[in-house]
């Protein structure tokens, strides 16, 4: 399958690196994604991560707008000004840079969250809170049947 699914929390090592979960690395390999486009998410305190196709999708949306419109300018500010390219090291680790830490509040652990065509980097407690809020908004209870 070529989708990013599930969520996994991994610890950041002493050098500021975190291992990307194996299933996520497998999707990256199958899609032949060498360079990761990382974007400060528009709705959540998370970093959205995908291949160049993620950036291209946003750029197509911007190109469909009037280039001088406030909407196109705002979108470009978010997509280009809030994005960077990163690469995994040979062991499949990602450097948790200030770009990631300052936007998300991540300090010692990262929760990787699958979002189908991309994944996100979250501070673990922020992810749990957002997930609980999403469930509550859909009428789901956190309680499990006995």
UniProtKB/Swiss-Prot annotation:
Keyword check for Hydrolase: no
Domain of life: Bacteria
GO BP, one annotated term: negative regulation of DNA-templated transcription initiation
Keywords attached to this entry: Cytoplasm, DNA-binding, Repeat, Transcription, Transcription regulation
GO molecular function terms listed in the Swiss-Prot or TrEMBL record: DNA-binding transcription factor activity; transcription cis-regulatory region binding
CDD domains, A to Z: MraZ_C, MraZ_N
UniProt-listed SUPFAM superfamilies: AbrB/MazE/MraZ-like
TM stretches of this protein: none
Localization in the cell: Cytoplasm, Nucleoid
Keyword Ribosomal protein: no
PANTHER family to which the protein is assigned, alphabetical: TRANSCRIPTIONAL REGULATOR MRAZ (PTHR34701:SF1)
The protein's assembly and partners: Forms oligomers.
Record's protein name: Transcriptional regulator MraZ
Naturally occurring in which organism (per UniProt): Agrobacterium fabrum (strain C58 / ATCC 33970) (Agrobacterium tumefaciens (strain C58))
Classification lineage: Bacteria, Pseudomonadati, Pseudomonadota, Alphaproteobacteria, Hyphomicrobiales
């Amino acid at each position: 399958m070529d989708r990013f699914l599930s969520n996994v929390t991994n610890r950041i090592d002493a050098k500021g690196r975190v291992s990307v979960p194996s299933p996520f690395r497998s999707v990256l390999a199958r899609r032949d994604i060498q360079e990761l486009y990382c974007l400060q998410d528009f709705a959540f305190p998370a970093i959205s991560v995908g291949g160049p196709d993620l950036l291209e999708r946003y750029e197509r949306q911007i190109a469909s707008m009037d280039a001088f419109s406030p909407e196109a300018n705002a979108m470009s500010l978010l997509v280009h000004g809030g994005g960077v390219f990163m690469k995994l090291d040979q062991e499949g680790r990602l450097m948790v840079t200030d770009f990631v830490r300052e936007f998300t509040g991540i300090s010692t652990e990262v929760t990787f969250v699958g979002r189908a065509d991309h994944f996100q980097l979250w501070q673990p407690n922020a992810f749990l809170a957002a997930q609980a809020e999403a469930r509550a908004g859909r009428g789901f209870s956190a309680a499990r049947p006995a």
